[in-house]
């Protein structure tokens, strides 16, 4: 049986559907989202909440001529379905499939790549300015969630947009704030009617007449404007946006399609920047997601009937969970330890800490720059702040790490979760640059554990260290090894030798250490004897251990789940060069100079050649070429 959704291959097809049938289309899309995401995993709650909003935008605007910029982008599933990607939607976030985020290389309807938060208004304003410079007339719409509005860049963009007065529509998708029904209903009515073309033309005519009345006309006009502003401020929460120079419409019921269509059609005709404030419900239409939207923010495969995860068995505890438990253990012994996160208490494993130590836990919102400098302030006053943040998001606070932490040598701990490849979220979320961008900062100590037990000891080391220190660990389950109950400090800058051999030294860091050890066993079966070193520290390196291995073998393989440029392997090369050991052959294994796409972590590691099989094969091939002439300190990638 054909459905409304079956008739849509592009936004033009959507516009052929009668308005009174759009609510039925919304329900079909929700059913499709549940069916596919329950099998593939993905971001569910946020997408269920913006179905009507996405339909209304594509119904009232003309993509791709009109530009849509989706902040963060994980809520763009309906947008993708309506723009010709329904037949490939079952591949979203899968290896070789379509992205879970907007991607310009994927569709002309994806106007701007997103993945990190709070960028949409800045990008949209840039597009609006480009339109003005070209003499164009297309519309630009930035869709941003209330959570992303906690990011400073969003307000920086609002400030300039209000100053420039260019046509830009900002849709504030508010799924958290509670507005009482009466005020919300009346305000929706006022916003729809007072922004209609008839009212605005009438308003202009009245203003013109008042200005021409001798003596008192201008005074009456000023009084009328004050009255209008006071009324709107009383009726709506839009005073901030209006103070920044925006027209404000809302709040609007975000699941009422007739209302959304009317408002967006009115907004199209406004001159200057405008904010359309839309109230939505995360998880709309699926009770488990509405009840617990956080649990259905990012999900794996699940049973639609029960909402319970399927296809996975309980395994080893995650690195994230062990980090959170260990930090709480340390905090019981040291009242100076405080925890900071940027809107990710669940994702960084700090919910338990927050419950046990609510006065020592700080969720600063999506404000990574503030999180780092806030931590610096706490450290300056004698506390031991632990800033738990995804590796990819710390990039947003680089200047604060330099200026506010390292320059003052303050004891801030950076707990970098999701270090390395993260899997299905792809290039915007892989944490593969931290070893490079932190290593060269003076005073920074940088370490990565080989397993979850070493993570615990490294965290103990970090909170005891007098200076900035970063600890990076991967996404996912640990190795399932027993955990030491007594925590100990690891001497700064010390590695450990896990295996000894004279043919080659494999020096690995973090998640690549155990694969390196497994690779050594494979090589041993072929008569190749390898020394395996768990470096533990990227900065400072265990100089003597590495130099001794270089002297012993004359041949070094480095392994890391980080960009090769400026990473761990580069640090080893620099050490050898500084010591004049130009006869040592070096091959670096890691992430080449490209962005890594989405896919299961094991698949990505295999593709990059940093799993056990890849390390063994690269080592064997490198040794086979050992007799051939090679430049000193060969930087083979």
Swiss-Prot record:
Keyword terms of this UniProt record: Isoprene biosynthesis, Magnesium, Metal-binding, Thiamine biosynthesis, Thiamine pyrophosphate, Transferase
Pathway(s): Metabolic intermediate biosynthesis; 1-deoxy-D-xylulose 5-phosphate biosynthesis; 1-deoxy-D-xylulose 5-phosphate from D-glyceraldehyde 3-phosphate and pyruvate: step 1/1
Gene3D superfamilies (UniProt xref): 3.40.50.920, 3.40.50.970
Family classification: Belongs to the transketolase family. DXPS subfamily.
Organism taxonomic ancestry: Bacteria, Pseudomonadati, Thermodesulfobacteriota, Desulfuromonadia, Geobacterales
SUPFAM superfamilies: Thiamin diphosphate-binding fold (THDP-binding), TK C-terminal domain-like
PROSITE patterns, alphabetized: TRANSKETOLASE_1, TRANSKETOLASE_2
Keyword Magnesium attributed: yes
Residue sites binding Mg(2+) per the record: 146, 175
The species this protein was found in: Geobacter sulfurreducens (strain ATCC 51573 / DSM 12127 / PCA)
Its job: Catalyzes the acyloin condensation reaction between C atoms 2 and 3 of pyruvate and glyceraldehyde 3-phosphate to yield 1-deoxy-D-xylulose-5-phosphate (DXP).
Pfam entry (one): DXP_synthase_N
Subunit structure: Homodimer.
CC annotations in GO: cytosol
Cofactor (UniProt): Mg(2+); thiamine diphosphate
GO function term, MF aspect, one: magnesium ion binding
A biological process term (GO) from this entry: 1-deoxy-D-xylulose 5-phosphate biosynthetic process
HAMAP family, alphabetized: DXP_synth
Residues reported in the UniProt entry to bind thiamine diphosphate: 74, 115-117, 147-148, 175, 286, 368
Source organism superkingdom: Bacteria
Reaction(s) catalysed (UniProt annotation): D-glyceraldehyde 3-phosphate + pyruvate + H(+) = 1-deoxy-D-xylulose 5-phosphate + CO2
Cofactor stoichiometry and binding remark: Binds 1 Mg(2+) ion per subunit. Binds 1 thiamine pyrophosphate per subunit.
Listed name of the protein: 1-deoxy-D-xylulose-5-phosphate synthase 1
Known EC number: 2.2.1.7
């Amino acid at each position: 049986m054909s459905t409304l959704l079956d008739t849509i291959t592009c936004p033009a097809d959507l516009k052929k559907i009668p308005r009174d049938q759009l609510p039925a289309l919304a329900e079909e899309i929700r059913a499709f989202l549940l069916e596919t995401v329950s099998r593939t995993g993905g971001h569910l709650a946020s997408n269920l909440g913006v179905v009507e909003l996405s339909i209304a935008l594509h119904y009232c605007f003309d993509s791709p001529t009109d530009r849509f910029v989706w902040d963060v982008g994980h809520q763009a599933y309906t947008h993708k379905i309506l723009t010709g990607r329904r037949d490939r939607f079952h591949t979203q976030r899968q290896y070789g499939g379509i992205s879970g985020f907007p991607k310009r290389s994927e569709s002309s309807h994806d106007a701007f790549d997103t993945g990190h938060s709070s960028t949409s208004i800045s990008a949209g304003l840039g597009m609006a300015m480009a339109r003005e410079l070209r003499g164009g007339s297309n519309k630009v719409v930035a869709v941003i969630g209330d959570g992303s509005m906690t990011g400073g860049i969003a307000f920086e963009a609002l400030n300039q947009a209000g100053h420039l007065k260019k046509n830009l529509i900002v849709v504030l998708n508010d799924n958290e704030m509670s507005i009482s029904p009466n005020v919300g209903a009346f305000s929706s009515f006022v916003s729809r009617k007072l922004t209609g073309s008839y009212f605005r033309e009438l308003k202009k005519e009245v203003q013109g007449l008042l200005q021409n009345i001798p003596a008192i006309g201008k005074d009456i006009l000023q009084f009328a404007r004050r009255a209008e502003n006071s009324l709107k401020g009383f009726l709506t929460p839009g005073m901030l946006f209006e103070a920044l120079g925006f027209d404000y419409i809302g709040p609007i019921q975000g699941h009422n399609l007739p209302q959304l269509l009317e408002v967006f059609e009115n907004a199209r005709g406004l001159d200057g920047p405008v904010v359309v404030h839309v109230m939505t419900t995360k998880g709309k239409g699926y009770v488990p997601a509405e009840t617990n939207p956080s649990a259905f923010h990012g999900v794996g495969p699940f049973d639609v009937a029960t909402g319970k995860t399927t296809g996975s068995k309980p395994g080893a505890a995650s690195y994230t969970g062990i980090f959170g438990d260990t930090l709480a253990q340390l905090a019981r012994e040291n009242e100076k330890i405080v925890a900071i996160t940027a809107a990710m208490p669940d994702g960084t494993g700090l919910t338990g800490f927050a419950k046990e130590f609510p006065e020592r836990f700080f969720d600063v919102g999506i404000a990574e720059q503030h999180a780092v400098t806030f931590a610096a302030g706490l450290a300056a006053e004698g506390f031991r702040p632990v800033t738990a943040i995804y590796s990819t998001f710390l990039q947003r606070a680089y200047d604060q790490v330099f200026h506010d932490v390292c320059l003052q040598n303050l004891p801030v701990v950076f707990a970098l979760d999701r270090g390395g490849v993260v899997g299905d979220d792809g290039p915007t979320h892989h944490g593969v640059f931290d070893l490079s961008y932190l290593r060269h900062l003076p005073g920074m100590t940088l370490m990565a554990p080989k397993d979850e037990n070493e993570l615990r000891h490294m965290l103990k080391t970090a909170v005891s260290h007098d200076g900035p220190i970063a600890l990076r660990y991967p996404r996912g389950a640990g190795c399932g090894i027993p955990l030491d109950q007594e925590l100990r400090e690891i001497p700064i800058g010390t590695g450990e030798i896990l295996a000894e051999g004279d043919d080659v030294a494999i020096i690995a860091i973090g998640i690549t250490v155990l694969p390196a050890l497994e690779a050594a066993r494979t090589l041993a079966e072929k008569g190749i004897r390898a020394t395996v070193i768990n470096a533990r520290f990227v900065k400072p390196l265990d100089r003597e251990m590495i130099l001794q291995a270089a002297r012993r073998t004359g041949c070094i393989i480095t392994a890391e789940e980080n960009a090769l440029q400026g990473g761990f392997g580069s640090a080893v090369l620099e050490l050898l060069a500084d010591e004049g050991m130009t006869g040592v052959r070096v091959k670096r294994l890691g992430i080449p100079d490209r962005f890594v796409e989405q896919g299961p972590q094991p698949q990505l590691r295999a593709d990059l050649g940093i799993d056990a099989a890849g390390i063994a094969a690269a080592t064997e091939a490198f040794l086979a070429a050992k007799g051939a002439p090679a430049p000193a300190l060969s930087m083979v990638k």
